[in-house]
Amino acid sequence: MHIGHGHFFQNLDGRPDHEVWRTEMALADRAERLGFASVWAVEHHFAGYSMSTDPLQFLTWVAGRTHRVKLGTMVSVLPCTTPSDWPSTPACLTTSLVDV
């Protein structure tokens, strides 16, 4: 069975941005240790409840701290990125641990 851990960067209670990021980073640090098979991140723009505009930035950080969890994006909003640049970022992370 494959169980993944999703990160939504939700800020429903008005916490400072750095607190939301620290919380998500702490959860990601625990994911591999607790046996999760993957870590997933979303991309949301122009939404007051979520502050994840670049899931690949977060997944790059996770990749540098983990060894076996797979990494994936739950949502990638391609119109908000440069199409020619987008494939190069996940390609730099790894060849076998990224699902986009």
Task: Describe the function of each predicted region.
Residues 1-73:
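N-terminal beta1-alpha1-beta2 module of alpha/beta enzyme domains
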Residues 2-19, 80-100:
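Flexible, glycine-rich active-site loops centered on histidine and acidic residues
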Residues 73-81:
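Active-site nucleophile and cofactor-binding loops and adjacent substrate-binding regions
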